[in-house]
Amino acid sequence: MQLHILNNPKDAALAADAEFLKQSLFNLLHEEASPLVVETVKLLSTSDDSAALIEKVLPQLDEQQTHDLTLACGLFAQILNIAEDVHHERRRQIHEEAGRGGAEGSLTETVRRLKAGKADGKSVQRQLDNTSVTAVLTAHPTEVQRQTVLNFNRRIRALLPQRERCTNADALARLRREIDTILLGLWQTSETRRHKLSVNDEINNGVSIFPMSFFEALPKLYRKMEHDFQTAYPDVRVPDILKIGGWIGGDRDGNPFVSAETLRFAFRRHADAVFRFYRGELDKLYRELPLSIRRVKVNGDVMALSDKSPDEETARAEEPYRRAIAYIMARAMGKARALGLGMGCKFGFLEPYASAQEFLDDLKKLQHSLIDNGSRLLAEGRLADLIRSVSVFGFHMMPLDLRQHAGKHADVVAELFQHAGLEDYNSLNEEQKQAALLRELSHQRPLYSPFITYSDHTRHELAIFNEARKIKDEFGEDAVTQSIISNCEQPSDLLALALLLKETGLLAVENGKPKSRINIVPLFETIEALENACPVMETMFRLDWYGALLESRGNIQEIMLGYSDSNKDGGYVTSSWCLYQAELGLVELFKKYDVRMRLFHGRGGSVGRGGGPSYQAILAQPAGSVAGQIRITEQGEVITAKYADPGNAQRNLETLVAATLEASILPDKKDPDAKLMQDLSDVSFKYYRELITHPDFIDYFLQTSPIQEIATLNLGSRPASRKTLARIQDLRAIPWVFSWMQNRLMLPAWYGFGSAVETLCEGNPDTLAALREHAQSNPFFQAMLSNMEQVMAKTDITLAENYAGLSESPDKAKVIFGMIKEEYRRSRKALLDLLQTEELLRDNRSLARSLALRIPYLNALNGLQVAMLKRLRKEPDNPHALLMVHLTINGVAQGLRNTG
């Protein structure tokens, strides 16, 4: 990587921040580590081959020195990440303050494009009214850092911008001391988790993002949306188009520890966080609105609230707004108490609000009165933000989806049938299953009996649905709105879930017609399932019963698409094309049956699991597939990187909204050449499958990656694999991708591409020209190549060869690695040919700069990891070697800013 890329004048502040933090870290090392460790770290920063340097130095280090060196390299990656994040925010602010208009991906730029595209106010309002964007936080185990460590990093991030504002040496010294103190705490804190996370731990971690970020970021973003739209379209109003959703506490696919109890715990924690936020905001409003009846007029609605106020202080007699706020707070906190939350209220407790809408109505009475009586500025400040917050967060803070494997649903149905004396469900063919399920769904008679003893699994599953019904009653109808069927393969999978909803009071049958309180969402995730998505849904749409069910849910059908398993099945090219084709087919099918479609994209953080920049990914969707409706999963390290800071959260959520609106209102795009893409997919699939089905491949993978050690990292509450590892399909997608990132091959994101391009273009210049034209003009192909370019820039075939040396069968490993190395050469060459460039990241200076900063420490961590894996394979019970491997996994993930 060319280090001269850091010499751009725009990056002077970044260079200064990085140097400032590095000096603090060296100050720490001089105090805490040996001179040999300090000298080695200094040499790494200028070394062209830091992995080789590690190999040379390591024999001279004892266990403590090895630990210190590993920790130091990881900390350097962390502080450079912080410096980069601060610089991104700095450049954004400079851009905005210079009045240059909106950057790509901003709402300002999107609104400008809408205006330039002659979109009128009515069409924009119509689109906004039909727009729904949701970022869904999941508990997928990809965040390697402990919350404690993340909190240290946030403190440094908050302090670092002060460096530029220090006007004298004393101020700079004080800042240095603060950061040195935090780094010392970080140095003396365990980087790795010693115990496995529980589901409740994951719930608490997910909830912590809200007071840290979302409670501030969402109202600010809505205010910006209103400003941007009303500047161009004065009459346009912005409804609640953006929300945060979650899976944490309701996703039991592969996780036996998720239960009715964890679902209840999740909503108690949600409500505790959101009611504390409301109480704090109401308290601030109380202090900000001491308006006197002698100075202002007040609407009758507010006077009526004031008359019922528990605030009886004499001084408040002439302050109706304060008295009204006291009344509102007492009722809101009354609801908190009714939900079992242990929080007080200085005004006592009044009759609880029955719904968030009642709470909202009272707040709007305050707002209308202020506006009507000349206090608009007060109405449009904190009060407006609180109104928006209540509208978005309600009493539940964020809705949770339920998710379970189709086979688990079928097991419950089979047991219910058995005890009810019905046919043997598992022995029925698909047509018979549909008929039996529709028969049971057509009337009100339940199958479940409280007088029968069911299996633990059936009791567990029915308990979750029953708990979801109670939660909807207590916390609001929007608390649980989706139930997702993973591994959905046939129509009976949807009908089986419908039957379970009926058995637990979430679906009623009235006059033969169903009415559901929850959306039934099929998840198509393997290559075969994606190809079968349209036939499955067409069968459902032809059923009058299902048509009536959709009517009860607003005639919207949500479809979830899985990126991870399809990639593991067929490789990146085939997965991408299968997903695109599935979307194209679904768009036409939904038009045919006049059903509105909402796609839910199950993307991971890495390219191998559908990751990459969200803006480009959304714009690369087929025309008509977005149509204002989109949900996207966000997980692990992505949640931390995108949303743990209010500024980052606002910017990343703004990008989601901007891309959704652009893809919906300005969908003028052409699809890629279907035959060309299919040919590329077919050949890529052939080469990818040749590799992963090679008889020696699974052993190579298990022996030359830290997959076994990743499983012991305590990243999350669910198991790393579904069964004993003997086949690739038994391994979960996250550790599969995570492992390839650790050994620096990133194989799932590119393997097969080079051979496909070479095969298609050999002796056929027209094909090469067509692919190059697609690389210049087609959003789908551009996004695919852009993601691949980013991954290949992080790939290091020389380091990967060191991992190949871990194999217990060198001759077999030589064959497998030879295949990988040759395909890497072909893929890199093909990528450069299609991009018509001589170097990767030529047009992505930001990522090139980022890698240039971190590569020395990243490569050193890989060198340390290989050495420690060798030691661990020889001494499986060596606790020091295992700890070092865990630390290097942590550090490499930080250096790459990706896990799975």
Swiss-Prot record:
Q: Which cofactor does it need?
A: Mg(2+)
Query: Sorted alphabetically, which keywords does the UniProt record give?
Result: Carbon dioxide fixation, Lyase, Magnesium
The protein's annotated catalytic reaction(s) are: oxaloacetate + phosphate = phosphoenolpyruvate + hydrogencarbonate
Superkingdom, natural source: Bacteria
Point out the signal peptide segment.
Answer: none
Pfam families in UniProt: PEPcase (PF00311)
What GO MF terms are annotated? magnesium ion binding; phosphoenolpyruvate carboxylase activity
Per the record, the coiled-coil ranges are none
Q: Does the keyword Cell membrane apply?
A: no
Enzyme Commission number(s) of this protein: 4.1.1.31
Of the GO CC terms on this record, one is: cytosol
InterPro entries, alphabetized: PEP_COase, PEP_COase_bac/pln-type, PEP_COase_Lys_AS, PEPCASE_His_AS, Pyrv/PenolPyrv_kinase-like_dom
Catalytic site positions: 140, 568
Keyword presence, Magnesium: yes
Return one Gene Ontology term, BP aspect.
Answer: oxaloacetate metabolic process
Tell me which NCBIfam families the record gives. Answer: PRK00009.1 (NF000584)
Q: Which family does it belong to?
A: Belongs to the PEPCase type 1 family.
Q: What does this protein do?
A: Forms oxaloacetate, a four-carbon dicarboxylic acid source for the tricarboxylic acid cycle.
The protein depicted here goes by the name: Phosphoenolpyruvate carboxylase
